[in-house]
Swiss-Prot record:
Annotated compartments: Plastid, Chloroplast
Origin superkingdom: Eukaryota
Keyword Chloroplast: yes
Phylogenetic lineage: Eukaryota, Viridiplantae, Streptophyta, Embryophyta, Tracheophyta
Protein name: Large ribosomal subunit protein uL2cz/uL2cy
Record key words, sorted: Chloroplast, Plastid, Ribonucleoprotein, Ribosomal protein
GO biological process: mitochondrial translation
Primary residence: plastid
GO molecular function, one term: transferase activity
Primary gene name: rpl2-A
Family (UniProt): Belongs to the universal ribosomal protein uL2 family.
Amino acid sequence: MAIHLYKTSTSSTRNGAVDSQVKSNPRNNLIYGQHRCGKGRNARGIITAGHRGGGHKRLYRKIDFRRNEKEISGRIVTIEYDPNRNAYICLIHYGDGEKRYILHPRGAIIGDTIVSGTEVPISMGNALPLTDMPLGTAIHNIEITLGKGGQLARAAGAVAKLIAKEGKSATLRLPSGEVRLISKNCLATVGQVGNVGVNQKSLGRAGSKCWLGKRPVVRGVVMNPVDHPHGGGEGRAPIGRKKPTTPWGYPALGRRSRKRNKYSDSLILRRRK
């Protein structure tokens, strides 16, 4: 979708850049309420993920990540905004009367036809196993476990690439730069996720950020020593350490956060950047 630039009529709209209007009129049988508890806190009520809280109430849209309506063509009826993700979603009317939401593929418009199955065309929005795709195909919504539904490359603008097939496995290059093996029988959707220009948006004011459930970010160097290892000192002072740390004293900016000795380590041929 196109990016709309605000006219500078007030201070809050200065330098603002948002998406052109995308309607949100979800079907009642494809949404349900969700209790957003925690706000970045663990079971003891301690903040473990900062800068979260508040925000507008949301209704969760049921997204079809499995694409298990096999060999039944569907038509794109609407393209809608989803408050739970940065990608758009589109409503599909299938030939058997089923109605489902899927992630909006880039370039898809209202009226286009999609289908999933084993012997379907390699065209945008179609879902099929990796074994039936030619090398170099751009894909998204990729399964890791057969039948579990897509788990990889689902964010706005995300796209992976099929680079090799050997034996029972296919080699993919993921959006993070990681190269890993996936079973050739797993399903994936052809094309790139839409809303590629999401990073070009500028909310323009703090209130718009609060609506999204994101709270202000405060630097540790301006805190007190009791609140952050970087805090304290007279006036503007350095952090007083060799390397930056988290509020809990662990190394920040570059520390590997992946758990060691995971079963999937053998499937990763090259780590993410």
